C-alpha cells in the first residue's frame, strides 16, 4: 500500500515538509510506502472551468497536476499539506486541489484522505477546515488525529520543538495506516465500498 503526501509550501524543506515527514515516518513504520511530492515551488494556475479535463481525461495545462493524477491512480491514501496564508491554505495547493479533484474525482473516492497545516501562530483551524472539504465532498474517509492536524513554528527547527504538533502528526500516520489495513482486510472479506446512487442535482434558481 502507498500514500502520497503533497507539500503545498513554497519551501521545499520547510515547516510543512517537516510535518509531512513526521507523518510519513509513522506510515513507514507501519509498513506503508510513502512518497512526498513537492508542488508548492511550481507555478500552479487555477481552474478556469473549461471542462477540458472532463472531455479529454486530463487538464490542458501541463504544470504537475496531470502527473500527480497519474500517480493517484495507484495510490491508496493521500495527505495534503499547506502553510497557512491569511487563515487559508496556500494559493498553490488550492489551485492544485481544485483541478485534481474536479477533473478526476473518481480516483479519490473510497480512499482515505487527510490534511496537515503549518503556521507561525494563528489561522490553522480555518485552513484545516478548508482542505478537509475536498475529502468530504468526494466520498473519502477522513483520517483524524488526537488534535487538529497542525504544527506551529517559523522554521523546521521550531516545528520540531512543537512536541504536541509532532505527536499529532505521528498519530495521524498511525491512524491512516490502521484504516488502510482495515480497508484491505474488508476487501479480502468481501466488503466493498458502497455503490453510489445516480447523482441528483439541485439548483436553487431555475
Residue ranges of each PLM-predicted region?
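N-terminal beta1-alpha1 ligand-phosphate binding loop
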Residues: 2-30
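Cofactor-binding loop segments of dinucleotide-utilizing enzymes, especially the Rossmann-like FAD-
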Residues: 6-9, 39, 117-120
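A short beta-strand-loop structural module common to alpha/beta enzyme folds
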Residues: 32-42
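Cysteine-cluster motifs in flexible loop/terminal segments that predominantly coordinate metals
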Residues: 42-72, 199-206
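Short, hinge-like loop/turn segments at secondary-structure boundaries
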Residues: 51-55, 132, 161-162
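Helix-loop-strand module that forms the ligand-binding subsite of alpha/beta enzymes
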Residues: 60-147
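Glycine-rich phosphate/pyrophosphate-binding loop and the adjoining helix
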Residues: 141-206
Amino acid at each position: 500500500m502507498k500514500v502520497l503526501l503533497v507539500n503545498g509550501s513554497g519551501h521545499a524543506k520547510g515547516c510543512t515538509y517537516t510535518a509531512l515527514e513526521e507523518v510519513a515516518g509513522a506510515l513507514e513504520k507501519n509498513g506503508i510506502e510513502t512518497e512526498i511530492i513537492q508542488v508548492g515551488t511550481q507555478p500552479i494556475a487555477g481552474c478556469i472551468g473549461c471542462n477540458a479535463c472532463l472531455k479529454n481525461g486530463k487538464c490542458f495545462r501541463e504544470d504537475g497536476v496531470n502527473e500527480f493524477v497519474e500517480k493517484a491512480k495507484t495510490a491508496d491514501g493521500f495527505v495534503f499539506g499547506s502553510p497557512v496564508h491569511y487563515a487559508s491554505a496556500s494559493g498553490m495547493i488550492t489551485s492544485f486541489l481544485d483541478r485534481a479533484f474536479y477533473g478526476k474525482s473518481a480516483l479519490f473516492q473510497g480512499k482515505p484522505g487527510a490534511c496537515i497545516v503549518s503556521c507561525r501562530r494563528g489561522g490553522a483551524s480555518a485552513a484545516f477546515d478548508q482542505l478537509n472539504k475536498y475529502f468530504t465532498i468526494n466520498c473519502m474517509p477522513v483520517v483524524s488525529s488526537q488534535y487538529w492536524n497542525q504544527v506551529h513554528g517559523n522554521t523546521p527547527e521550531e516545528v520540531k520543538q512543537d512536541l504536541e504538533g509532532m505527536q499529532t502528526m505521528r498519530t495521524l500516520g498511525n491512524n491512516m495506516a490502521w484504516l488502510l489495513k482495515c480497508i484491505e482486510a474488508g476487501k479480502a472479506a468481501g466488503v466493498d465500498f458502497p455503490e453510489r446512487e445516480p447523482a441528483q442535482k439541485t439548483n436553487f434558481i431555475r
